[in-house]
From Swiss-Prot:
Chief location of this protein within or outside the cell: secreted
Propeptide residues per the UniProt entry: 24-51
Gene Ontology CC annotation, any one: extracellular region
Protein name: Ectatotoxin-Rm1a
Taxonomic path: Eukaryota, Metazoa, Ecdysozoa, Arthropoda, Hexapoda
Span of the signal peptide: 1-23
Valine amide: residues bearing it: 78
Cellular compartment(s): Secreted
Purpose: Toxin that paralyzes and kills insects.
Source organism: Rhytidoponera metallica
């Protein structure tokens, strides 16, 4: 059985990245700073996502109205 080339490359890359992370002495130099950066990234993503929520809600309402109109048209056409 032959292993696909991309799978072999992926295994090598993952193995090397893991070994390099563990081998490097300052891989996790300051866990508090990393946790703070992750929390800040989530807060920024949430702040950017909020203005999109009303647009998504209106698009969903429009799709629902179109589906109802389509079903009404179909029921008149069939029945």
């Amino acid at each position: 059985m032959e292993i696909p080339k991309f799978l072999l490359i992926a295994i090598i890359v993952v193995g090397l990245s893991g070994s390099l992370t563990w081998a490097h002495s300052s891989a996790i130099a300051n866990p508090e700073a990393i946790a703070e950066a992750i929390a800040e990234a989530f807060a920024n993503a949430e702040a950017e996502a909020e203005p999109v929520a009303p647009i998504v809600a209106m698009a969903g309402l429009g799709l629902f109205a179109a589906a109802v109109a389509g079903l009404d048209w179909l029921s008149k056409k069939v029945g």
